[in-house]
UniProtKB/Swiss-Prot annotation:
SUPFAM superfamilies: Anticodon-binding domain of PheRS (SSF54991), Class II aaRS and biotin synthetases (SSF55681), Nucleic acid-binding proteins (SSF50249), PheT/TilS domain (SSF56037), Putative DNA-binding domain (SSF46955)
Cellular localisation: Cytoplasm
Protein name: Phenylalanine--tRNA ligase beta subunit
Every tRNA-binding domain range: 38-148
Binding locations of Mg(2+): 460, 466, 469-470
Organism: Wolbachia sp. subsp. Brugia malayi (strain TRS)
Catalysed reactions, as listed in the record: tRNA(Phe) + L-phenylalanine + ATP = L-phenylalanyl-tRNA(Phe) + AMP + diphosphate + H(+)
GO biological process terms, semicolon-separated: phenylalanyl-tRNA aminoacylation
Cellular component, GO annotation: phenylalanine-tRNA ligase complex
The keyword Heme is assigned to this record: no
Domain FDX-ACB: 698-790
Domain B5: 406-482
Chief location bin: cytoplasm
Subunit structure: Tetramer of two alpha and two beta subunits.
Gene it is expressed from: pheT
């Protein structure tokens, strides 16, 4: 929302400086985005050439006597179009040309003093190409006035709930409530007949007296009013109105159109002016027919449907309600009769129509945020009077149609809530004053309980908490008391964000997939019971809520492989629905292809099941679960390879699964290469804090020993790891670094190579202790699995 300082001061009586005003705006929640202060352009003046004579020393130059409104100056000029009586732009001494950054000084040109420069459009950066002559101004420019509008322009961000602040008057009201100034009252005379100052009977749709245009509403959700102004003389807007609109980025069209834009910017009341002679019969607010076409004021043609409200007569559509007027009835300089519309349209309908048609206008922006229904008639009076004042003509009575819910919104409010929930110290009289200045009517029902009537322009205020916010906002967020933090407060860390950081650090890319999947695919993954069936799926491939993220990740993997991305690591955190209870959040990841991108430093290798296991363990460690406290068992999920997968459990509860995906599952997605994956249910981790395990500094040297056992191929590797871990308190780490089966080994046998780390927290281990622990490991594995030591 852009406005000038002088525009604001028409609505706000204040002695505050520009800086004080902008600071206060930000403090009350109307964030100042930008302030453009054009005072550096104050030296460019509207001037008039009084006399032109040849330069005594140069044929191509001329001596000009120029009136700048206060004195006559001598200017040397070489422009071909300089002549007596011409109004142009004078760059006064001390001003700086925008194009060249040249500062104007008294200069002798071929022996003759020049006291300024007569400017071309390109020198003022008003034209892209170099101008051939100096600027020629129309007669409505007054000599001595500043050429540029040097009024500071303030640009603020307005949140979607504050449609009332999409107007200069609404902004002034908020500022006045802070005590920085006083809101000026809305006083106007009206060109509309005096007996028609209100809308008393809206049940009489289309009431009219002297207008030749009637109105009707049949879309069931709109209200429209209007006035017919005859015998107008439309023309260019006066300079003050042009300057005001152009300063906030609006293009001047004509006096009638500019007046409607001026009312919109001043009071937040969108309006539309029709060339009344182009309207045949009634103006009707209705739903468009499918396939109807409409050409807007912007010259574009739009294909409409029956969700879009339009305003039409017997033959043509003249506007899309609340969004844009039609080309067929636009006001031009030849317009003599005007129908001026002031209406209320449903914000949701305007928003939907605007999105469907991809049209965004100043009008739709305001209607979508709910304009003030209480200002419909006032806006009509303001605009009609301005049109009659500037363009002449005679206004009819008001016509209106449709329904408008003007029921008063009242909120029961305990003023003690302000200090209780806002952590401020505001006196009741101060609260009462703030609410009154914001337009709320407050009746004190009891000492503590107030009955507050909400003004028509504040549709966002509906509950007591809204009133608490209003008081605290105006009183000052900077006055909220500081509260010391309580000692030993546990900081809640976002689990999902921590896991995302971890996965990305391990080379994964995050993806987001649908929460739906195909029931037939789910059944092939072993999910057949307790599925969440969707009653109205948008297609049969998405007819259940997903019981696992893995199938969706496999589909993403397949799509990437088809497009040449055979090396892939992706993960997702999202809800899964594996029972009829509430959804649970899962972390799932997939790897395929090589473990590293090709490079000349390292040799890549194909990913394997141990990569997936390492990913899962890294995720579990975020929950303070060390690898030593985990048990590994055969995978419970049917879609993993039975001999190359596992379940990691913590405190007898399954926390995650990992493994190579079953070949039959990969065939479903037409994947021809090895894929490994993992998944964990975050709720299964309980209420453990999400933090790294405290580092233990072992002061004594650790010792590593490698063991290779020959065991039957049906022995679970996880079982061996678990028993070795638990065999001694001196063992700090156990991991598999090699699995072999093939030549020189019986078909039903395999070799499992373990690396075991020993360390004592109290002393450095001696060889006898290490040998004792090693023998215990060999005996333990042989006793429980029949495995024999191959080498150490």
């Amino acid at each position: 929302m852009r406005f000038t300082l002088s525009w604001l001061l028409e609505h706000l009586e204040t002695n505050a400086s520009l800086e004080e005003i902008t600071d206060k705006l930000t403090h009350i929640g109307l964030e100042v985005k930008d302030v453009v202060d054009n005072t550096k352009l104050a030296g460019f003046i509207v001037a008039k050439v009084l006399e032109v004579t040849p330069h005594p020393n140069v044929d191509k130059l001329k001596l000009c006597k120029v009136d700048n409104g206060s004195k006559i100056l001598q200017i040397v000029c070489g422009a071909n179009n300089v002549r007596e009586g011409l109004k142009t732009v004078l760059a006064s001494l001390g001003s700086t040309l925008p194009e060249s950054n040249f500062t104007i000084k008294p200069t002798k040109i071929r022996g003759v003093l020049s006291e300024g420069i007569l400017c071309s459009a390109s020198e003022l950066m008003l034209a892209q190409e170099k101008s051939k002559g100096i600027i020629e101004l129309s007669d409505d420019y007054k000599v001595g006035n500043k050429f540029f509008n040097c009024d500071p322009v303030i640009d603020i961000n307005v949140t979607t709930n504050r449609g009332d602040c999409l107007s200069v008057h609404g902004i002034a009201r908020d500022l006045a409530a802070t005590g920085i100034g006083t809101l000026n009252s809305l006083i106007y005379s009206s060109a509309i007949p005096a007996h028609d100052t209100g809308i008393q009977d809206r049940s009489k749709s289309g009431m009219t007296r002297s207008s030749s245009i009637n109105v009707k509403v049949i879309d069931g959700e709109s209200f429209i009013s209007g006035v017919y102004i005859s015998n107008v003389r439309n023309k260019e807007s006066p300079r003050w109105l042009k300057d005001r609109l152009e300063s906030v980025g609006m293009r001047s069209i004509s006096a009638i159109v500019d007046i409607t834009n001026y009312i919109m910017m001043s009071f937040g009341r969108p309006m539309h002016a029709y060339d009344a002679k182009k309207i045949e019969g009634k103006l009707i607010v209705r739903k468009a027919n499918n396939g109807e076409k409409f050409t807007g004021l912007n010259g574009k043609e739009y294909l409409l449907n029956n969700d879009i409200s339009v305003i039409s007569d017997n033959n043509n559509i003249h506007a899309i309600a609340g969004i844009i007027g039609g080309k067929c009835s636009k006001c031009t300089l030849e317009t003599t009769d005007v129908f001026l519309e002031s209406a209320w349209f449903n914000p949701i309908s305007v928003t939907k129509s605007s999105r469907q048609l991809n049209i965004s206008t100043d009008s739709s922006y305001r209607f979508a945020r709910s304009v003030d229904p209480g200002f419909i008639l006032d806006g009509l009076h303001f605009a009609a009077q301005m049109i009659v004042d500037l363009c002449g003509g005679k206004a009819s009575n008001v016509v209106f149609a449709g329904s408008l819910d003007e029921a008063d919104t009242k909120v029961s409010f305990d003023y003690q809530d302000v200090n209780k929930f806002g952590s401020v110290s505001v006196l009741p009289d101060e609260m009462f004053d703030i609410l009154t200045k914001l337009g709320f009517s407050t009746d004190k029902k009891t000492e503590n309980n107030w009955n507050v009537k909400v003004p028509s322009w504040r549709s966002d205020v509906t509950i007591p908490a809204d009133l608490v916010e209003e008081v605290v906002r105006i009183y000052g967020y900077d006055k909220i008391k500081e509260e010391p933090l309580i000692d030993n407060v546990e900081v809640e860390i976002n689990t999902h964000d921590n896991l995302r950081v971890l996965m990305i650090s391990r080379g994964f890319h995050e993806v987001f997939t649908w929460s739906f999947m195909s029931e037939s695919i789910a059944e092939k993954f072993g999910y057949s019971n307790k599925l969440f069936i969707i009653d109205n799926p948008f297609n049969n491939n998405f007819n259940i809520m997903r019981p696992s993220i893995v199938p969706n990740l496999l589909q993403v993997t397949a799509d990437n492989i088809v497009h040449g991305m055979s090396d892939l690591a992706i993960f997702e955190i999202g809800p899964v629905y594996d029972s009829l209870d509430q959804p649970k959040y899962s972390l799932s990841g997939i790897r395929t292809g090589n473990n590293l991108p090709r490079n000349h430093y390292n040799t890549d290798r194909k990913i394997d099941v141990f990569d997936a296991k390492a990913d899962l363990i890294a995720a579990l460690e975020l929950f303070n679960v060390s690898y030593g406290n985990l048990t590994i068992e055969r995978a419970e999920k049917e879609y993993y390879h039975p001999g190359k997968s596992g379940t990691l459990s913590f405190k007898n509860k399954a926390t995650g699964y990992f493994g190579e995906l079953h070949p039959n599952i990969l065939d479903l997605f037409d994947i021809k290469q090895k894929v490994v994956g993992f998944e964990m249910i975050l709720e299964n981790m309980g209420n453990l804090p999400v933090s790294r395990e405290k580092f233990i500094d072992y002061k004594h040297q650790s010792v590593k020993r490698d063991f290779a056992f020959i065991v039957n191929r049906d022995v679970e590797v996880g079982k061996i790891i678990n028993m070795v871990k638990k065999s001694s308190e001196l063992i700090t780490e156990v991991f598999v670094f090699d699995v072999y089966h093939g030549n020189n080994m019986e078909p039903n046998k395999m070799s499992i190579a373990l690396s075991v780390t020993f360390c004592s927290p109290t002393h450095t281990l001696i060889e006898e202790e290490i040998q004792k622990e090693s023998s215990a490991i060999v005996n333990l594995v042989h006793k429980n699995t029949g495995g024999i030591l191959r080498y150490t």
